């Protein structure tokens, strides 16, 4: 099964959306295998957003993501990287489809509730920033046979 990294950003935590967001992924049939509630260090944030170093918004992005607690999660499921991206909606909430997480809850591109890995390679890199291998729990979901062939 494929894994991805999802992070509820400080605005999602402050607005009390953690339960709602987790519920959406559980109801879709995805399996939570790791979760942490933490405040990112500047070093973690800079490592996470390394691809944006040198861009005009980099400093503000790092300052924002370390401004409050986040929920770091590892989810598992069939095609989870692409499906979770669809569930989140476009990065810019103004372009996010109604019913997506960002289309429903986000207002501003700089406060867009959630981050999700954009590829399996990104997921692997991002998960390594937040989780040790022994922090991801292998478990059998009894209803898995009802979700996928």
From Swiss-Prot:
Q: State any GO CC term.
A: cytoplasm
Q: What is its main location?
A: cytoplasm
The superkingdom of the source organism is Bacteria
Its EC top class is transferase
Q: Name the EC number(s).
A: 2.7.4.6
Q: Which cofactors does it use? A: Mg(2+)
Q: Nucleotidyltransferase among the record's keywords?
A: no
Q: Which is a GO BP term held by this UniProt record? A: UTP biosynthetic process
Ligand binding (ATP) = 9, 57, 85, 91, 102, 112
Q: Where in the cell is it found?
A: Cytoplasm
A single GO molecular function term of this UniProt record: nucleoside diphosphate kinase activity
Annotated active site: 115 (pros-phosphohistidine intermediate)
| Catalysis performed (reactions) | a 2'-deoxyribonucleoside 5'-diphosphate + ATP = a 2'-deoxyribonucleoside 5'-triphosphate + ADP; a ribonucleoside 5'-diphosphate + ATP = a ribonucleoside 5'-triphosphate + ADP
Q: Report keywords, A-Z.
A: ATP-binding, Cytoplasm, Kinase, Magnesium, Metal-binding, Nucleotide metabolism, Nucleotide-binding, Phosphoprotein, Transferase
Note the SMART domains from the entry.
NDK (SM00562)
Q: Which InterPro entries does the record associate with it? A: NDK-like_dom (IPR034907), NDK-like_dom_sf (IPR036850), Nucleoside_diP_kinase (IPR001564), Nucleoside_diP_kinase_AS (IPR023005)
* Job description of the protein: Major role in the synthesis of nucleoside triphosphates other than ATP. The ATP gamma phosphate is transferred to the NDP beta phosphate via a ping-pong mechanism, using a phosphorylated active-site intermediate.
Checking HAMAP family in the record gives:
NDP_kinase (MF_00451)
The record's family statement is: Belongs to the NDK family.
The UniProt entry, under PANTHER family, shows: NUCLEOSIDE DIPHOSPHATE KINASE
Subunit: Homotetramer.
Write the protein's name: Nucleoside diphosphate kinase
What is the protein's species of origin?
A: Heliobacterium modesticaldum (strain ATCC 51547 / Ice1)
Top-level taxonomy? Bacteria, Bacillati, Bacillota, Clostridia, Eubacteriales
State the gene name recorded for this protein: ndk
